[in-house]
């Protein structure tokens, strides 16, 4: 049986932690931030851990883990 390909978009956007959780950047930080307060901007800086249901879907895009 042939090897499975990893979705290149998922490879660029998600990282798998040592415990198997998925980390991803937070959406909505590129432009039009004037209307948001500082707390919103600060809390959405960096990465967040994905939910369990999203993790199951995204892991199917990365069959070998990366």
Curated annotation (Swiss-Prot):
One of its GO terms (molecular function) is structural constituent of ribosome. Disulfide bonds: none annotated. The keyword Ribonucleoprotein applies. The keyword Membrane does not apply. It comes from Caulobacter sp. (strain K31). HAMAP family: Ribosomal_bL35. Gene3D superfamilies: 4.10.410.60. This is Large ribosomal subunit protein bL35. GO terms for cellular component: cytosolic large ribosomal subunit. It comes from the Bacteria. Keywords: Ribonucleoprotein, Ribosomal protein. Pfam families: Ribosomal_L35p. Belongs to the bacterial ribosomal protein bL35 family. One of its GO terms (biological process) is translation. The lineage of its organism: Bacteria, Pseudomonadati, Pseudomonadota, Alphaproteobacteria, Caulobacterales.
């Amino acid at each position: 049986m042939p090897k499975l390909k990893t979705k290149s978009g998922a490879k660029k956007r998600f990282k798998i932690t040592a415990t198997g959780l998925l980390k991803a950047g937070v959406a909505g930080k590129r432009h039009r931030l004037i209307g948001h307060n500082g707390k919103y901007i600060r809390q959405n800086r960096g990465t967040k851990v994905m939910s369990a249901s999203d993790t199951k879907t995204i892991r199917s895009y990365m069959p070998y883990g990366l």
